[in-house]
Amino acid sequence: MRLKDKVILVTASTRGIGLAIVKKCAQEGAKVYMAARNLERAKEIADTLQGVNCVYNDENKPETFSSMVEEVVTDAGRIDVLVNNFGTSNPGKDLDFVNTDPQVFLDTVNLNLRSVFMASQAAVKHMAVHGGGSIINISFVGGLVPDISQVAYGTSKAAINYLTKLIAVQEATHCIRCNAVLPGMTATEAVESHLSDDFKNLFMKHIPLGRMGLPEEIAEAVCYFAGDASAYTTGQILTVSGVFGLATPLYGDIANSKAKR
Protein backbone atom coordinates (compact mmCIF):
# COMPACT_ATOMS: atom_id res chain seq x y z
CA MET A 1 0.00 0.00 0.00
CA ARG A 2 1.41 3.35 -1.11
CA LEU A 3 0.43 5.37 1.96
CA LYS A 4 0.79 2.81 4.74
CA ASP A 5 0.87 4.45 8.19
CA LYS A 6 0.95 8.01 6.85
CA VAL A 7 -1.12 10.53 8.81
CA ILE A 8 -3.23 12.54 6.39
CA LEU A 9 -5.60 15.45 7.04
CA VAL A 10 -8.15 16.34 4.36
CA THR A 11 -10.28 19.49 4.58
CA ALA A 12 -13.83 19.82 3.23
CA SER A 13 -14.03 16.06 2.90
CA THR A 14 -17.61 14.87 3.34
CA ARG A 15 -18.52 14.84 -0.35
CA GLY A 16 -17.23 15.11 -3.90
CA ILE A 17 -13.50 15.27 -4.51
CA GLY A 18 -12.69 15.53 -0.80
CA LEU A 19 -14.54 12.33 0.05
CA ALA A 20 -12.93 10.50 -2.87
CA ILE A 21 -9.52 11.56 -1.52
CA VAL A 22 -10.37 10.30 1.96
CA LYS A 23 -11.50 6.92 0.63
CA LYS A 24 -8.49 6.44 -1.63
CA CYS A 25 -5.97 7.41 1.04
CA ALA A 26 -7.62 5.02 3.49
CA GLN A 27 -7.52 2.23 0.90
CA GLU A 28 -3.81 2.87 0.50
CA GLY A 29 -3.18 2.31 4.21
CA ALA A 30 -3.14 5.85 5.58
CA LYS A 31 -4.60 7.05 8.85
CA VAL A 32 -6.96 9.72 7.57
CA TYR A 33 -8.60 12.63 9.36
CA MET A 34 -11.67 14.20 7.80
CA ALA A 35 -11.93 17.90 8.63
CA ALA A 36 -15.51 19.12 8.46
CA ARG A 37 -18.03 21.59 9.84
CA ASN A 38 -20.72 18.93 10.05
CA LEU A 39 -19.10 16.43 12.40
CA GLU A 40 -22.23 14.31 12.56
CA ARG A 41 -22.13 13.77 8.81
CA ALA A 42 -18.36 13.18 8.89
CA LYS A 43 -18.66 10.58 11.64
CA GLU A 44 -21.37 8.72 9.72
CA ILE A 45 -18.97 8.42 6.80
CA ALA A 46 -15.94 7.61 8.94
CA ASP A 47 -17.78 4.75 10.61
CA THR A 48 -18.04 3.01 7.23
CA LEU A 49 -14.31 3.30 6.49
CA GLN A 50 -11.24 1.76 8.07
CA GLY A 51 -8.61 4.05 9.56
CA VAL A 52 -10.65 7.25 9.23
CA ASN A 53 -11.28 9.79 12.00
CA CYS A 54 -12.90 13.23 12.18
CA VAL A 55 -11.83 16.68 13.35
CA TYR A 56 -13.73 19.94 13.41
CA ASN A 57 -12.96 22.78 11.02
CA ASP A 58 -15.12 25.71 10.00
CA GLU A 59 -13.59 27.82 7.25
CA ASN A 60 -15.50 30.81 8.59
CA LYS A 61 -13.75 30.49 11.97
CA PRO A 62 -10.00 31.12 11.48
CA GLU A 63 -9.07 29.74 14.89
CA THR A 64 -10.26 26.26 13.86
CA PHE A 65 -7.42 25.79 11.37
CA SER A 66 -4.75 25.57 14.04
CA SER A 67 -7.03 23.62 16.39
CA MET A 68 -7.79 20.93 13.78
CA VAL A 69 -4.06 20.41 13.15
CA GLU A 70 -3.36 20.31 16.89
CA GLU A 71 -6.07 17.70 17.33
CA VAL A 72 -4.54 15.49 14.64
CA VAL A 73 -1.04 15.81 16.10
CA THR A 74 -2.28 15.14 19.63
CA ASP A 75 -4.07 11.99 18.50
CA ALA A 76 -1.58 10.62 15.95
CA GLY A 77 1.69 12.14 17.15
CA ARG A 78 2.40 13.94 13.87
CA ILE A 79 0.93 15.07 10.55
CA ASP A 80 2.54 13.76 7.37
CA VAL A 81 0.19 15.10 4.69
CA LEU A 82 -2.24 18.01 4.49
CA VAL A 83 -4.75 18.12 1.64
CA ASN A 84 -6.33 21.56 1.29
CA ASN A 85 -9.55 20.75 -0.52
CA PHE A 86 -11.82 23.59 0.61
CA GLY A 87 -13.15 25.93 -2.05
CA THR A 88 -16.23 28.10 -2.20
CA SER A 89 -17.86 29.99 -5.03
CA ASN A 90 -20.96 32.07 -5.66
CA PRO A 91 -21.87 31.30 -9.28
CA GLY A 92 -24.93 33.54 -9.30
CA LYS A 93 -22.90 36.61 -8.31
CA ASP A 94 -19.34 35.70 -9.34
CA LEU A 95 -19.65 36.96 -12.89
CA ASP A 96 -17.36 38.70 -15.36
CA PHE A 97 -14.88 41.39 -14.29
CA VAL A 98 -17.19 44.39 -14.74
CA ASN A 99 -20.33 42.91 -13.21
CA THR A 100 -19.00 41.06 -10.16
CA ASP A 101 -19.87 42.73 -6.88
CA PRO A 102 -16.65 43.84 -5.10
CA GLN A 103 -17.75 42.26 -1.82
CA VAL A 104 -18.40 38.91 -3.52
CA PHE A 105 -14.91 39.11 -5.02
CA LEU A 106 -13.26 39.94 -1.69
CA ASP A 107 -15.21 37.33 0.28
CA THR A 108 -14.48 34.52 -2.21
CA VAL A 109 -10.77 35.28 -2.49
CA ASN A 110 -10.49 35.70 1.27
CA LEU A 111 -12.15 32.40 2.15
CA ASN A 112 -10.39 30.28 -0.47
CA LEU A 113 -6.92 31.71 0.01
CA ARG A 114 -7.18 31.99 3.78
CA SER A 115 -8.10 28.33 4.15
CA VAL A 116 -4.93 27.22 2.36
CA PHE A 117 -2.70 29.76 4.08
CA MET A 118 -3.87 29.10 7.63
CA ALA A 119 -4.11 25.31 7.40
CA SER A 120 -0.70 25.08 5.73
CA GLN A 121 0.93 27.44 8.21
CA ALA A 122 -0.38 25.37 11.12
CA ALA A 123 0.73 22.09 9.53
CA VAL A 124 4.19 23.33 8.54
CA LYS A 125 5.06 24.15 12.15
CA HIS A 126 4.59 20.50 13.08
CA MET A 127 5.99 18.99 9.89
CA ALA A 128 9.21 20.97 10.32
CA VAL A 129 10.00 19.30 13.64
CA HIS A 130 8.92 15.82 12.56
CA GLY A 131 11.13 15.35 9.52
CA GLY A 132 9.02 16.98 6.82
CA GLY A 133 5.76 16.32 5.04
CA SER A 134 3.63 16.98 2.00
CA ILE A 135 1.04 19.69 1.39
CA ILE A 136 -1.35 19.21 -1.52
CA ASN A 137 -3.60 22.05 -2.62
CA ILE A 138 -6.71 21.28 -4.65
CA SER A 139 -6.88 24.22 -7.03
CA PHE A 140 -8.70 24.54 -10.37
CA VAL A 141 -7.72 24.68 -14.02
CA GLY A 142 -9.48 28.07 -14.13
CA GLY A 143 -6.62 29.39 -12.04
CA LEU A 144 -4.44 28.97 -15.12
CA VAL A 145 -6.90 29.73 -17.92
CA PRO A 146 -9.12 32.82 -17.54
CA ASP A 147 -12.84 32.11 -17.77
CA ILE A 148 -15.66 34.30 -19.09
CA SER A 149 -17.10 34.38 -15.56
CA GLN A 150 -16.05 33.39 -12.02
CA VAL A 151 -13.54 36.22 -11.74
CA ALA A 152 -13.32 35.77 -7.96
CA TYR A 153 -13.05 31.97 -7.91
CA GLY A 154 -10.47 31.88 -10.69
CA THR A 155 -8.40 34.63 -9.08
CA SER A 156 -8.42 32.83 -5.74
CA LYS A 157 -7.20 29.62 -7.37
CA ALA A 158 -4.48 31.47 -9.28
CA ALA A 159 -3.29 32.85 -5.95
CA ILE A 160 -3.31 29.34 -4.48
CA ASN A 161 -1.14 28.15 -7.36
CA TYR A 162 1.39 30.88 -6.52
CA LEU A 163 1.23 30.09 -2.81
CA THR A 164 1.90 26.44 -3.65
CA LYS A 165 5.18 27.36 -5.31
CA LEU A 166 6.12 29.78 -2.56
CA ILE A 167 5.62 27.18 0.18
CA ALA A 168 7.60 24.64 -1.87
CA VAL A 169 10.55 27.02 -2.12
CA GLN A 170 10.51 28.39 1.41
CA GLU A 171 9.91 25.09 3.22
CA ALA A 172 12.19 22.83 1.16
CA THR A 173 14.93 23.10 3.78
CA HIS A 174 12.54 21.41 6.21
CA CYS A 175 11.85 18.59 3.72
CA ILE A 176 8.30 19.85 3.28
CA ARG A 177 6.94 19.48 -0.23
CA CYS A 178 4.02 21.42 -1.66
CA ASN A 179 2.18 20.66 -4.89
CA ALA A 180 -1.20 21.48 -6.40
CA VAL A 181 -3.75 19.37 -8.25
CA LEU A 182 -5.96 21.29 -10.67
CA PRO A 183 -9.18 19.50 -11.64
CA GLY A 184 -11.13 20.48 -14.70
CA MET A 185 -14.84 19.74 -14.94
CA THR A 186 -15.33 16.81 -12.58
CA ALA A 187 -18.43 14.65 -12.17
CA THR A 188 -19.30 15.58 -8.60
CA GLU A 189 -22.79 15.90 -7.17
CA ALA A 190 -22.42 19.69 -7.23
CA VAL A 191 -21.57 19.77 -10.93
CA GLU A 192 -24.32 17.33 -11.82
CA SER A 193 -26.98 19.27 -9.91
CA HIS A 194 -25.91 22.89 -10.51
CA LEU A 195 -25.03 22.88 -14.22
CA SER A 196 -27.50 22.39 -17.04
CA ASP A 197 -27.06 19.55 -19.51
CA ASP A 198 -26.72 22.10 -22.31
CA PHE A 199 -23.82 23.80 -20.55
CA LYS A 200 -22.09 20.52 -19.71
CA ASN A 201 -22.40 19.31 -23.29
CA LEU A 202 -21.03 22.59 -24.61
CA PHE A 203 -18.15 22.48 -22.15
CA MET A 204 -17.25 18.90 -23.00
CA LYS A 205 -16.81 19.85 -26.65
CA HIS A 206 -13.66 21.59 -25.49
CA ILE A 207 -12.28 18.67 -23.46
CA PRO A 208 -10.10 16.65 -25.86
CA LEU A 209 -10.66 13.44 -23.87
CA GLY A 210 -14.39 13.98 -24.39
CA ARG A 211 -15.70 13.48 -20.87
CA MET A 212 -15.73 14.88 -17.36
CA GLY A 213 -13.14 13.70 -14.89
CA LEU A 214 -14.04 11.47 -11.97
CA PRO A 215 -13.40 12.39 -8.32
CA GLU A 216 -11.45 9.14 -8.01
CA GLU A 217 -9.06 10.32 -10.74
CA ILE A 218 -8.33 13.48 -8.78
CA ALA A 219 -7.74 11.30 -5.71
CA GLU A 220 -5.16 9.24 -7.62
CA ALA A 221 -3.13 12.38 -8.32
CA VAL A 222 -3.33 13.33 -4.65
CA CYS A 223 -2.07 9.89 -3.63
CA TYR A 224 0.96 10.35 -5.85
CA PHE A 225 1.89 13.63 -4.18
CA ALA A 226 1.15 12.18 -0.73
CA GLY A 227 3.36 9.13 -1.21
CA ASP A 228 7.08 8.47 -1.30
CA ALA A 229 7.06 8.08 -5.09
CA SER A 230 6.98 11.89 -5.30
CA ALA A 231 9.70 12.47 -2.69
CA TYR A 232 11.72 14.62 -5.13
CA THR A 233 8.70 16.39 -6.65
CA THR A 234 7.66 19.75 -5.23
CA GLY A 235 6.35 23.09 -6.43
CA GLN A 236 4.39 21.45 -9.24
CA ILE A 237 1.01 22.44 -10.66
CA LEU A 238 -0.64 19.30 -12.05
CA THR A 239 -3.75 19.67 -14.19
CA VAL A 240 -6.15 16.73 -14.21
CA SER A 241 -8.54 18.09 -16.79
CA GLY A 242 -8.61 15.83 -19.84
CA VAL A 243 -6.31 18.38 -21.54
CA PHE A 244 -8.90 21.13 -21.15
CA GLY A 245 -7.14 24.48 -21.11
CA LEU A 246 -4.23 23.31 -23.23
CA ALA A 247 -5.88 22.92 -26.62
CA THR A 248 -6.61 25.87 -28.91
CA PRO A 249 -9.86 27.71 -28.05
CA LEU A 250 -11.13 26.57 -31.45
CA TYR A 251 -10.76 22.91 -30.49
CA GLY A 252 -14.46 22.28 -29.93
CA ASP A 253 -15.37 23.70 -33.34
CA ILE A 254 -12.52 22.12 -35.27
CA ALA A 255 -12.49 18.61 -33.78
CA ASN A 256 -15.56 17.38 -35.64
CA SER A 257 -15.46 19.81 -38.52
CA LYS A 258 -15.00 18.78 -42.13
CA ALA A 259 -13.48 22.14 -42.98
CA LYS A 260 -10.03 21.96 -44.56
CA ARG A 261 -7.18 24.37 -44.01
Language-model segments: which ranges?
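Short C-terminal tail/terminal secondary-structure segment
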Residues: T234-R261
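Short, small/polar-rich loop/turn modules that mediate ligand/substrate recognition or access, typified
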Residues: A172-R177, T233-G235
